[in-house]
Amino acid sequence: MTVLYTSASLKKMKCLAFNMGMNCVRTVSHARSGGAKFGGRNVFNIFDSKTPDSVRIKAFKNTIYQSAMGKGKTKFSAMEINLITSLVRGYKGEGKKNAINPLQTNVQILNKLLLTHRLTDKDILEGMNLAAGPVNVAIPRDITPQEEKKKVELRNRKAENMDLHPSRKMHIKELLHSLNLDMCNDEEVYQKISLYLQKNEESRTSVGASQQNHVDIDINSLKRYLQNIEKKARQKSAIDKQKKNQARIYQWNTQSFSEIVPLSAGNILFKREPNRLWKRLQNGISVFLGSNGGGKKSKTTKKVLQGNNILLHSLENNKDMTLSNNFDHSVFNINFTDLFGVINASGSPPDRVLNEINEIELKGWKCVGNLYDNNKIVVFQSSNPLLEDTKIPQKSFTNSKRFLISLSALLASFFAYYRYRLSQRQESKK
């Protein structure tokens, strides 16, 4: 086996060659790159995009390591200081704690991040590109005292509009105008809104003594509250209109509409007596032909629901309101549900609600549900039984049948007499 011995001179030559290679990697002509002093020596500019990225990153890491270990006095340029500071601040967990650290502390932190591989080459390259990019710095002009005064007034005005004060009546009117609410009685609306704000103020007294004179109101909640007031006002006006219409009842001549007659001035102004003989003849012919009119109509029982009246019962004040079947029920949003649904949604003791419902149902009403927007109001409908149309009496039907038979016999006799006279005339001519 051959053993090779390396002399000391050969080792020295290898070390010199290695150091020369490192210097070749680190150094480039200062005049060629237009560089600056980096790490205290005339080396290339690491922010030069013409230099390969790997070479720039490697040179930057080596200089940070040398400066952190205290090997020589390092002088960094302004761009390099910005790069070091941005890398330390940009790393997650180090930015806020070391935002105002001195340069040497930032170098120590950056070296630690590089050694633990928590900072990648991609992060270093992005930081170099950002630091080397052009920065537009616009120097703001001086603000005049008049402009500063206007800015303060505008800020105070915005802060004032954000608050709602119950003691200010004009502010409530402005809010109603912004919500496009056309209320007839502004005083009543103002009193209700003020009471609503006062309740909110009393409920917020536990927050703190400094906030007792300040009321923070949700605009959406206030808008829904005002919409409920407007809806109740529409319902009240509809009920009043329905009551006025009930007071004006006209006595129309129902006999003139019992049969289809041609429309004319005489039919409108004067009472028209129906022809009873012709009507009886029509009924008799209808029965004889087996049509659906006349007597056969009496066999078909037509069901008519008598009593569609609505009763609204309030569980709060125990008051009732009755609406006739001519009233437009679409104004009220009725929730049709069973008895258990009404009791559960009322929020009142079940025994009391059940007793009130039973008392009203004993008067001939039937519980059908409640109102969607107010579960305290129970809706009832009159529960009168289905009545049948009155049948034509059997005597009237018999009389019509007799009249029809008599008329048929009369026509047959007339036809037979006509044939008899015709045959006699023909015989006399012969």
From Swiss-Prot:
It comes from the Eukaryota. It is found in: Mitochondrion; Mitochondrion membrane. Its main location: mitochondrion. The chain crosses the membrane at residues 403-420. Residues 1-27 form a transit peptide. Keywords: Membrane, Mitochondrion, Transit peptide, Transmembrane, Transmembrane helix. One of its GO terms (cellular component) is mitochondrial membrane. Induction: During M phase of cell cycle. It is a single-pass membrane protein. Component of MIOREX complexes, large expressome-like assemblies of ribosomes with factors involved in all the steps of post-transcriptional gene expression. Associates with the mitochondrial ribosome. This is MIOREX complex component 4. The gene is MRX4.
